[in-house]
Amino acid sequence: MFITKPENFSFRNTIHSHGWSELNPFAIDEEKWRLKYVFGGNEFSRLIPVELSETNKKVKVEFKGRKPGKKDRTVLAAKIKHVLRFDEDLVDFYRLVGKEKDFAWMVKTNSGRLLRSPSVFEDLVKTICTTNCSWAMTKIMVSNLVEKLGDVHGGLHLVQLLSEFGHLCPGRMLRHLQPGLLE
């Protein structure tokens, strides 16, 4: 499957924009420049592991396993556009930063989009894990949550299960969240 990308889009700059690609359940292959993720949840009929890469004018979506049906592919395309921020119109942003000597490089490199998670909940959990700690501790906390409380599919951890954490007692969640306790 291919998704047409916006004119001013850089796959590499977006996936490396602020570190989200380093946090589970995203996985990045920097040799082949692929971003891996398993989509799932109530919107899909099943779990859908994908690898995203860039072609000339499109983002290539490779399915790992059975190809999803038409309805799942439609929802998946919308989620991928959301994750890569295709819906962000950066024309005014580029016009403003293009006037500034120190920021003109952003226009030339199509920078400015920030990778985000498919759900607000996942972004919220990750943002909370960045508060008042180092990046190394953030990575440990997010990994502990995803790896200890999520499922694995095709070698990748599923984060949509984070949205189901409400049924867990706070003590159990804290044991998994605290860095270094479950090494």
Which stretches of residues belong to each language-model region?
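HhH-family (HhH-GPD) DNA N-glycosylase catalytic core used in base-excision repair
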Residues: 1-183
